[in-house]
Design a protein with these regions (language model features):
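Conserved Class I S-adenosyl-L-methionine
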Residues: 44, 169-173, 186-260
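A conserved beta-strand element that flanks and buttresses the S-adenosyl-L-methionine
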Residues: 103
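Short catalytic micro-motifs in class I SAM-dependent methyltransferases
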Residues: 106-107
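A short glycine-rich, Lys/Arg-flanked "PGG" loop and its adjoining helix->strand segment in the class I
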Residues: 115-127
């Protein structure tokens, strides 16, 4: 998926973060004093806005795509504490030891290696600052398809997508080792079922899938293949609605340690 293409505007905006996500993240921040947070790879600003809703005084959304930042600007216009900056995760537009919290949600699977990004995270975080990574492992991705886990049908309908997904997903062991080698202490790791959307009817889910909205993996399918996938999901889901679509994620909560 080309995140810079104007045809993909609003692909990663237009919804709110799940209440369970807000509660989970807030609980991990409860013992920390967070003045400045940065949402790296902020896309359309959904989680930039969520960090502000938690009560963080200053939130910086960073993305390399001007189109995504334009979407984020619209989504975050009511939040005075949000600032948006254009930049790459391997060369963050943040001063050294300037940030108390870095969030990287749905980012690292777009990277060939996490090492340059984790080095930048270590540079920009204050000592004791928190680094929250949210992404899917292969175990998360390849759960069977169901009414809630619609994504599972992608891989049963088109097994070649499994190979594409396998190339871009890092194992939990890899993430843990990369955190350790860059001076982070892993505080907590957990899986999180996050509600993606509540579709009033099956037809609305199928329309959403047809738009490929927020699902970069579907850009690997031709229009004809996408139509086939939509048909497979249509025939697989018996209930008409409402459909509560969820994704399972892995969360890694790490703390920057003092200089070794």
């Amino acid at each position: 998926m080309d995140f810079h293409d104007k045809r993909n505007q609003n692909s990663y905006s237009g919804r709110n973060a799940d209440s369970r996500w807000l509660t989970t993240i807030a609980s991990h921040l409860s013992r920390k004093h967070i003045d400045i947070a940065a949402d790296i790879g902020c896309g359309g600003g959904i989680y930039t806005r969520a960090l502000a809703m938690i009560g963080i005084p200053h939130v910086i959304g960073v993305d390399s795509s001007a189109q995504m930042l334009a979407d984020a600007k619209k989504a975050c216009r009511e939040f005075q504490q949000i600032e948006l900056r254009k930049g790459d995760c391997e060369d963050l537009p943040l001063a050294s030891e300037s940030t108390d919290l870095l969030l990287a949600r749905a980012l690292i699977h777009h990277l060939p290696s996490v090492q340059p990004f984790f080095q930048e995270a270590a540079r920009t975080l204050t000592r004791g600052g928190l680094f929250i990574i949210q992404n899917r492992t292969l175990d998360d991705c390849f759960l069977p398809g169901s009414t809630e886990h619609v994504r599972g049908y992608f891989f049963s309908a088109f097994p070649r997508l499994r190979k594409i997904e396998a190339k871009r997903r890092f194992s939990s062991a890899y993430v843990r080792q990369a955190l350790h080698s860059n001076g982070f202490l892993l505080l907590h790791e957990e899986t999180l079922w996050e509600t993606r959307a509540i579709h009033p009817s099956k037809q609305e889910l199928l329309v959403d899938l047809s738009k490929r909205k927020g699902r970069s993996i579907l850009h690997q399918l031709s229009d004809q293949e996408l139509a086939k996938l939509v048909h497979v999901i249509d025939t697989s889901l018996e209930q008409d609605g409402p459909i509560v679509e969820k994704d399972r994620w892995t969360l890694w909560i790490a703390e920057k340690q003092a200089e070794r």
